[in-house]
């Protein structure tokens, strides 16, 4: 394996972790409700699936934009990651109403779309940047699925304060990667 591939693997793993923290934090809240193990498995699987579909769609759009915009596209991608990270960080400190939705049927579908929308934006940025699609969606799907499961399971045991901090950590990580693309460091 080349150093470039290993670097991309590490970078994408950290990004996948950051995006999965959103699903983890919401999973913590959902986990406070009594769920059976089968429901926990199904919820994590659906969240992981949407964290594959959304960045893939974003990467396809990003690849098209990259061809049209050239070098400027990298800066646009960095700006998108930065803004997404700031939004995620700010949202973590807002006192919001109960974010819980029914963990089945349409409620689960809306939940999965909601927590994977940021993956579309990141996928757009990575498509502009020219990232490996298969590696990206595999990591995003696995990380989000496992972190959702972890959030649901830990949610049964832990108070809700951890959810705010995990979402803030995810936002900070995205800000750092956005700055990395924006600033030639």
UniProtKB/Swiss-Prot annotation:
The keyword Transmembrane applies. GO terms for biological process: intracellular manganese ion homeostasis; manganese ion export across plasma membrane. It comes from the Bacteria. It is found in: Cell membrane. It is a multi-pass membrane protein. The keyword Manganese applies. Keywords: Cell membrane, Ion transport, Manganese, Membrane, Transmembrane, Transmembrane helix, Transport. GO terms for cellular component: plasma membrane. The chain crosses the membrane at residues 4-24, 40-60, 64-84, 108-128, 134-154, 165-185. GO terms for molecular function: manganese ion transmembrane transporter activity. Its main location: membrane. InterPro entries: Mntp/YtaF, Put_MntP. Belongs to the MntP (TC 9.B.29) family. Probably functions as a manganese efflux pump. This is Putative manganese efflux pump MntP. It comes from Bacillus subtilis (strain 168). The lineage of its organism: Bacteria, Bacillati, Bacillota, Bacilli, Bacillales. The gene is mntP.
């Amino acid at each position: 394996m080349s150093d470039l591939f290993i670097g991309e693997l590490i970078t994408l793993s950290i990004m996948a972790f950051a995006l999965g923290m959103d699903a983890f934090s919401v999973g913590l809240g959902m986990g406070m409700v009594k769920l059976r193990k089968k429901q926990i498995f199904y919820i994590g699987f659906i969240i992981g699936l949407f964290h594959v579909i959304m960045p893939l769609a974003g990467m396809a759009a990003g690849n098209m934009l990259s061809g049209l915009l050239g070098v400027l596209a990298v800066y646009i991608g960095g700006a998108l990651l930065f803004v997404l990270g700031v939004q995620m960080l700010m949202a973590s400190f807002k006192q919001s109403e109960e974010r819980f939705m029914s963990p089945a049927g349409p409620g689960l579908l809306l939940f999965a779309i909601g927590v994977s929308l940021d993956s579309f934006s990141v996928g757009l940025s990575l498509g502009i940047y020219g990232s490996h699609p298969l590696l990206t969606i595999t990591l995003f799907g696995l990380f989000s699925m496992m972190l959702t499961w972890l959030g649901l399971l830990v949610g049964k045991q832990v108070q809700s304060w951890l959810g705010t901090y995990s979402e803030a950590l995810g936002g900070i990580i995205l800000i750092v990667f956005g700055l990395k693309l924006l600033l030639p460091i």
